[in-house]
C-alpha cells in the first residue's frame, strides 16, 4: 500500500463528521441577514410514562457580538421548556448539538431526545416520503428542559453584521460562539441556578470538551454533566497516517464487530461481546507487537497475525498480507462484503449499499447518509415550518461546508497545547480538575466506524487526571452505530442511561 493511498483516509475522524457536515450542502442565502432577532413561541403537550407534560417551544435566533459589541451572527435554537413548573431556577437545562464541524443539529433534534422524532427503518434504508413524525416517548422533557443549537452557518444560523467565517469556523471560535449563546440564554431565562448539561454528538463531543472548559474559565459557569455521544477528543487516534500504526490497532475490534454482524466470519461465534473481548486482547497484544516491529517483523510473524486477523475480520489472509497487515477503514468497507456486491457503512456499519465499481479499493460513499438523510431533511423542514412556525421563507442548511476551511490551530489555555494538534482531551481534563464534581458519560456504538469505541477507551484512560476524578467518568455501549438513537431498542436504553445520568449529576 502506498503512502498516497493511505493519505486518502488520513483524518478518518474528519471523514466521519465531514460526511455529516457536507451531506445535503446548500448554498448560503444570497443576501446577508439583518441583525434583528426573530422568535416564534408555541404551546404543546406530550405524554411520557403516562404523564401529560405541557411545554413551550421557542424557536428563534440569538444575536452574537464581538468584543467591541458589534453584531457578528444570529444563532438558531429551539428550546423546550416545561410549562407546569413554577420555579424553573432549579430545574435542569441541557444544551444539545451535533458535530461536523459544520453540521446542523437536526439529527439529535429529530432523532433523540426532543418531543418529536422522525420514524426511520432500523439499520436499513428508509423509503422515500411520506415520512412520519411522531411524539417521542424517549424525550428527556420529564427530566430536563432542552435547547437544541445549530452551529453558525447551519440550520437557520447565519453570519451577520461585522461577522466573517473566520469568527466562527475554528475549534476555539466555534466554542466561543456556543459559550456566548449559552451564557446569553442562561441570563435571559433566569437559569443560573439550574443544573446545566452539555449533550454533544461526534464533533459535538470535541466541541463539548472545549466548551465545557471555556464556560467555566470565561463565564465561571460550572456544569453538572457532559454527555458525549459517539466521542472523539483526539483525532490522531482515528488517523491512518504513514508510519503511525495506532488507528489500525484501534479499529480492529470494530472490524470484528462489523464482520460478526454481517455474518462474514467462517467461524462466527454465537455471542458478540466475548468475541469482542478476544478481539480487543489480540489487537492490544499480538497485533500491536507485530505492527510496532515494522519492517523488522518476520514472514512467520506476519503470517501468524494475518491468519488471526482474517479470523476476526472476515478478510482473506491473502488480502491482509498484501495490505502489509494494515487495512484502513475505507478499504475494509469496500472489501468485507465485496463478494455480495455491497459496501458497508462508516457512520453505521450495519448499513450497506450497492456500488458501481466492485473492483474499487476503497468505499467512496457511506450508505448510512442515503439511508436516513432524506427522512431527516424532510422532517426538520416540515416540523420547523408547520409546528414551530419558523423559517418557511428561508433555507434550513444541513451543513455550512466549513470542514475544509476549519481552523484547527488552538488559541491556548486550559492545559498544554501545540498549534494545530487535533486533541482536546486536555480541555476536558482541565474542566474536570477545575470542577471536581463534573460528571461525564460516554455513549459508544459498537458498529460505529466513524468514532469507534476502542480509541475512545484509550483517550479516556489517558486523561492524566486523579483517580477520584476518573471515577466521575462512565462508559455505556449499544449494539448500534454512530447515532444509536435510530435503533428503537437502543433509543430506549440511551434515554434511560442519559436520564439516570442527569438525575445523578443534579443531586448535589
What are the residue ranges of the model-derived segments?
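Catalytic histidine-centered segment of alpha/beta-hydrolase-like enzymes
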Residues: 479-490
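A catalytic-pocket lid/entrance helix-loop region that shapes and gates access to the active site
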Residues: 115-119, 216-311
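Short alpha-helix in the alpha/beta-hydrolase fold that links the catalytic acid
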Residues: 438, 452-462
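Alpha/beta-hydrolase fold catalytic core
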Residues: 293-450
